From Swiss-Prot:
Family classification: Belongs to the G-protein coupled receptor 1 family. Opsin subfamily.
Protein name: Green-sensitive opsin-1
Topology in membrane: Multi-pass membrane protein
UniProt-listed GO biological process terms: phototransduction; visual perception
Subcellular location, principal: membrane
Organism: Carassius auratus
PROSITE patterns: G_PROTEIN_RECEP_F1_1 (PS00237), G_PROTEIN_RECEP_F1_2 (PS50262), OPSIN (PS00238)
Sugar attachment sites: N2, N15
Cytoplasmic-side segments: 62-73, 134-152, 231-252, 310-349
Entry keyword Glycoprotein: yes
Bias (Low complexity) ranges: 334-349
Source taxon at top rank: Eukaryota
Tissue: The color pigments are found in the cone photoreceptor cells.
Amino acid sequence: MNGTEGKNFYVPMSNRTGLVRSPFEYPQYYLAEPWQFKILALYLFFLMSMGLPINGLTLVVTAQHKKLRQPLNFILVNLAVAGTIMVCFGFTVTFYTAINGYFVLGPTGCAVEGFMATLGGEVALWSLVVLAIERYIVVCKPMGSFKFSSSHAFAGIAFTWVMALACAAPPLFGWSRYIPEGMQCSCGPDYYTLNPDYNNESYVIYMFVCHFILPVAVIFFTYGRLVCTVKAAAAQQQDSASTQKAEREVTKMVILMVFGFLIAWTPYATVAAWIFFNKGADFSAKFMAIPAFFSKSSALYNPVIYVLLNKQFRNCMLTTIFCGKNPLGDDESSTVSTSKTEVSSVSPA
């Protein structure tokens, strides 16, 4: 084995070097230079300083503006809640540990950080699935006329949390475990070891199939059908400027949704899968650290894609920020009316 396994950790360096120490007790500067840990801390500070205001502002604006309390917007707010969880319980901890060069909070802190980060990421992922299914049902009409109501929205939100807990909770109860990963400053599920006491292999397979491959397949299918439906509608109404505009907006939103998710999470999932299927292979700490920390950026641009590109949310945000005045000069009332019409037709909401 080209790594060192200890109690509640796996360091991707052989102990034959004589350098390996517990990531809960000693700085891991033999894995990366101290300045690289400081760069990591700076990156996380950037995500915190941007992600918390954007996600927090989404929640504040929704609370202030009754017109935003539409069923579909509840799912968008759920995304902001997920992002806030990742920032408050994941990024802050990792920022602190990166400054120190090791996971100073111990195994219990590692389990809590890994759980909260996984929970936030999974809530966001399954929120996207609910959005995809809602758009598919409303636009493609496989069930005929369908109105997305508040009860549907709350059921969808409950579904996202149930699925997220089904993924994040098992390592807390003995099915796999959370251990430091990459540069040993953040924690995630144990892809690395074959410890029979934790049944890591069955958990990782379950997680990949049920909490990555399945939701990605649903997103691709539903948005693929959505684009085809919008294109067909545009072809039948070529003189309709509103339909053509709707096609462009939906296509742009679909591209941003799909690529935003894939860009954030596919590198991490790919590297984790490679490590899982090549246990004992030689790899550096940065090989896992880079995609792991890059995936955290989703907490920043998720609200940009799913909220700031929504005219209704954007105008209300600007009104809140500028104390009741919208510097863009958009008519908020007409925007709300347009937004409501688009939600029930072919817009990306």
